[in-house]
């Protein structure tokens, strides 16, 4: 896969949540919500200011991130599902 996000956009692969609760109950696919955690797969060069300077993205490939429930746009590349979103949509980095 060769996709390079533009400006401050980030390509994220969702990290699937556990399908079993702590009590041992399995959650069916129909009851699961989309995960709000993911791993960064690709990062754009950064956002350009009005005077032409580039503000680099503060994230890197491999970072595990938390994002909003409705953040980003779902896309499919070579059969795999990804999200493409702006750096502002990222709520935090999971360390």
From Swiss-Prot:
Taxonomic superkingdom: Bacteria
Gene3D superfamilies associated with the record: GroES chaperonin (2.30.33.40)
Any one GO molecular-function label of the UniProt entry: metal ion binding
Keywords, alphabetical: Chaperone, Cytoplasm
GO biological process: chaperone cofactor-dependent protein refolding
Entry's Gene Ontology cellular component terms: cytoplasm
Compartmental location: Cytoplasm
InterPro entries: Chaperonin_GroES (IPR020818), Chaperonin_GroES_sf (IPR037124), Chaprnonin_Cpn10_CS (IPR018369), GroES-like_sf (IPR011032)
Major localisation: cytoplasm
PROSITE patterns for the chain: CHAPERONINS_CPN10 (PS00681)
Pfam families in the cross-refs: Cpn10 (PF00166)
Transmembrane feature ranges: none
NCBIfam families, per database record: PRK00364.1-2, PRK00364.1-5, PRK00364.1-6, PRK00364.2-2, PRK00364.2-4, PRK00364.2-5, PRK00364.3-3
Summary of the function given for this chain in its UniProt record: Together with the chaperonin GroEL, plays an essential role in assisting protein folding. The GroEL-GroES system forms a nano-cage that allows encapsulation of the non-native substrate proteins and provides a physical environment optimized to promote and accelerate protein folding. GroES binds to the apical surface of the GroEL ring, thereby capping the opening of the GroEL channel.
Assembly with partners or alone: Heptamer of 7 subunits arranged in a ring. Interacts with the chaperonin GroEL.
Protein name: Co-chaperonin GroES
